[in-house]
Amino acid sequence: MNHLDRLERKIGYCFNDIALLKQALTHRSAATQHNERLEFLGDSILNFTIAEALYHQFPRCNEGELSRMRATLVREPTLAILARQFELGDYMSLGSGELKNGGFRRESILADCVEAIIGAMSLDQGLAVTTQVIRNWYQQLLAEIKPGDNQKDAKTRLQEYLQGKHLPLPTYEVVNIQGEAHCQIFTVECKVKSAGKIDRTFVAKGSSRRKAEQAAAEQILKELDIK
């Protein structure tokens, strides 16, 4: 059994075209044929699959409640948990700089890899098989999730925390966009102010402006130990 066979057993899916899996595991720092286009595809499929599951699971919930639960299930920390369960860091191809910086442990890289694998599965055997695999991955998470305040996304939780402390709201600014139009990486700066002075600046990246802003807000929540 080779190392990719072991990974296939962990994710519960066997590829017909193993080259798709190899590409899904390849970070942009390692090769020109990397996983960002697959990540773009997988992100959309994951959002649809989880939205459909929640729609049927919670027939009495309104759009806002469903959206918050979906955001919880598809956000970066949740995907990173799945990635660690699969031990994806042991299988990824990263450039030397990312390896030295511990990229195989970074939540954003792990989360992106999960989405890329989803995209690769859809190209390999289609949507029906892929959505079933995703549902298998999320079986316990879907069973445990419930509507409520704890489902609010990171930006909302940070905003409510600052408002409760009568502090200015954070500002988000896109400071860099890399890549071609179909697979861009956004870098966002989030500044948190207190009493008119800038206290901290946090920087995060994502495959969309929304993802980068959420990742920056998540960093601040962790720093401030806000649940």
UniProtKB/Swiss-Prot annotation:
<dbReference type="GO" id="GO:0003725">
    <property type="term" value="F:double-stranded RNA binding"/>
</dbReference>
<keyword id="KW-0698">rRNA processing</keyword>
<dbReference type="GO" id="GO:0046872">
    <property type="term" value="F:metal ion binding"/>
</dbReference>
<feature type="active site">
    <location>
        <position position="115"/>
    </location>
</feature>
<dbReference type="InterPro" id="IPR036389">
    <property type="entry name" value="RNase_III_sf"/>
</dbReference>
<feature type="binding site">
    <location>
        <position position="112"/>
    </location>
    <ligand>
        <name>Mg(2+)</name>
    </ligand>
</feature>
<dbReference type="GO" id="GO:0008033">
    <property type="term" value="P:tRNA processing"/>
</dbReference>
<keyword id="KW-0699">rRNA-binding</keyword>
<keyword id="KW-0255">Endonuclease</keyword>
<dbReference type="GO" id="GO:0010468">
    <property type="term" value="P:regulation of gene expression"/>
</dbReference>
<dbReference type="GO" id="GO:0005737">
    <property type="term" value="C:cytoplasm"/>
</dbReference>
<keyword id="KW-0694">RNA-binding</keyword>
<keyword id="KW-0507">mRNA processing</keyword>
<dbReference type="GO" id="GO:0019843">
    <property type="term" value="F:rRNA binding"/>
</dbReference>
<dbReference type="GO" id="GO:0004525">
    <property type="term" value="F:ribonuclease III activity"/>
</dbReference>
<keyword id="KW-0460">Magnesium</keyword>
<keyword id="KW-0819">tRNA processing</keyword>
<keyword id="KW-0479">Metal-binding</keyword>
<keyword id="KW-0378">Hydrolase</keyword>
<comment type="function">
    <text>Digests double-stranded RNA. Involved in the processing of primary rRNA transcript to yield the immediate precursors to the large and small rRNAs (23S and 16S). Processes some mRNAs, and tRNAs when they are encoded in the rRNA operon. Processes pre-crRNA and tracrRNA of type II CRISPR loci if present in the organism.</text>
</comment>
<feature type="binding site">
    <location>
        <position position="115"/>
    </location>
    <ligand>
        <name>Mg(2+)</name>
    </ligand>
</feature>
<comment type="similarity">
    <text>Belongs to the ribonuclease III family.</text>
</comment>
<comment type="subunit">
    <text>Homodimer.</text>
</comment>
<dbReference type="InterPro" id="IPR011907">
    <property type="entry name" value="RNase_III"/>
</dbReference>
<feature type="binding site">
    <location>
        <position position="39"/>
    </location>
    <ligand>
        <name>Mg(2+)</name>
    </ligand>
</feature>
<keyword id="KW-0963">Cytoplasm</keyword>
<keyword id="KW-0540">Nuclease</keyword>
<feature type="domain" description="RNase III">
    <location>
        <begin position="4"/>
        <end position="126"/>
    </location>
</feature>
<dbReference type="Pfam" id="PF00035">
    <property type="entry name" value="dsrm"/>
</dbReference>
<feature type="domain" description="DRBM">
    <location>
        <begin position="153"/>
        <end position="226"/>
    </location>
</feature>
<protein>
    <recommendedName>
        <fullName>Ribonuclease 3</fullName>
        <ecNumber>3.1.26.3</ecNumber>
    </recommendedName>
</protein>
<dbReference type="Pfam" id="PF14622">
    <property type="entry name" value="Ribonucleas_3_3"/>
</dbReference>
<dbReference type="InterPro" id="IPR014720">
    <property type="entry name" value="dsRBD_dom"/>
</dbReference>
<dbReference type="GO" id="GO:0006397">
    <property type="term" value="P:mRNA processing"/>
</dbReference>
<dbReference type="GO" id="GO:0006364">
    <property type="term" value="P:rRNA processing"/>
</dbReference>
<dbReference type="InterPro" id="IPR000999">
    <property type="entry name" value="RNase_III_dom"/>
</dbReference>
<feature type="active site">
    <location>
        <position position="43"/>
    </location>
</feature>
